[in-house]
């Protein structure tokens, strides 16, 4: 019986070879299509590091210079920031609004923009996604990040940041397990320009891992304070991040 089976298989070897080739091709194509879908589906189940439900984005706009009520004296950076903070206070007092913060950047969690840099600790390179925030404006509280290493979101918002200070995500400990606490540690950055000195950055606070997009597993997230905001940055792409109260619909 076995001899007969082998004889039949040999007689049909060409046809069987084509069937095997088709089976392999179908298997490869199925894997090629389903593997990315599986990865995307899995990534979407991972926590973002903040609560996206109840968050809205409202763009900041200015009157055109030809408008009757346009005031040229109000267009400088000082008056622009004063007016932005005035609008921010009004937003927070609006019924149904829990908190609000200005976003004068293209790079923040959930945005379509992105900014990246590579820092270093000792000899270890650390690629990171950079988000920018204005201190003392409720950025961390409005997003609702998860705190780490003791500081509250309010404390992270209201620290007196200096140039080259950073807030980082706790997943950095995965590659720096021996440092203990991240707060207080220093990273450095070497520019490609040989004429520039090494720049050092101080870690002032830590939040849990943040993913900028729900379809990505994400990378290390760093938050850099914006200490000098110009008026054109506010009007060209500035917006308000608004968090609604839990019982208020986004519709």
Named regions from a protein language model:
Residues 116-149:
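The feature marks short, hydrophobic/small-residue-biased sequence motifs that occur predominantly
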Residues 1-10, 87:
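A short amphipathic helical element positioned immediately N-terminal to and/or at the very start
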Residues 67-83, 126-130, 160-164, 177, ...:
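Solvent-exposed, non-transmembrane alpha-helical starts
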Residues 87, 93, 170-171, 195-251:
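"Rare, low-scoring activations can occur
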Residues 34-126:
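Membrane-proximal extracellular/periplasmic loop immediately following the first transmembrane helix
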Residues 96, 126-131, 141, 151-167, ...:
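Beta-strand-rich non-transmembrane domains
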Residues 12-41, 50:
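Short, strongly hydrophobic transmembrane alpha-helices
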């Amino acid at each position: 019986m076995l001899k007969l089976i082998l004889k039949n298989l040999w007689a049909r070897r060409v046809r069987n070879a084509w069937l095997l080739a088709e089976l392999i091709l179908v298997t490869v194509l199925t894997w090629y299509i389903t593997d990315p879908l599986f990865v995307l589906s899995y990534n979407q189940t991972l926590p973002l590091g903040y609560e996206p439900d109840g968050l809205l984005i409202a763009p900041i706009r200015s009157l055109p210079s030809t408008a009757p009520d346009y005031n040229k004296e109000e267009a400088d950076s000082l008056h622009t920031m004063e007016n932005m903070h005035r609008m921010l206070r009004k937003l927070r007092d609006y019924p149904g609004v829990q908190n609000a913060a200005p976003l004068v950047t293209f790079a923040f969690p959930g945005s379509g923009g992105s900014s990246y840099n590579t820092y270093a600790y000792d000899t270890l390179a650390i690629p990171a996604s950079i988000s920018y925030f204005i201190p003392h404006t409720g950025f961390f509280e409005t997003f609702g990040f998860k705190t780490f290493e003791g500081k509250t979101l309010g404390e992270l918002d209201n620290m007196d940041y200096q140039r080259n200070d950073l807030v980082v995500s706790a997943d950095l400990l995965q590659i720096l397990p021996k440092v203990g606490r991240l707060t207080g540690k220093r990273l450095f950055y070497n520019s490609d320009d040989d004429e520039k000195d090494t720049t050092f950055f101080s870690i002032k606070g830590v939040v849990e891992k943040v993913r900028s997009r729900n379809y990505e597993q994400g990378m290390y997230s760093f938050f850099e304070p914006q200490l000098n905001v110009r008026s054109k940055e506010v009007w060209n792409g500035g917006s308000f991040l608004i968090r609604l109260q839990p019982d208020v619909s986004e519709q």
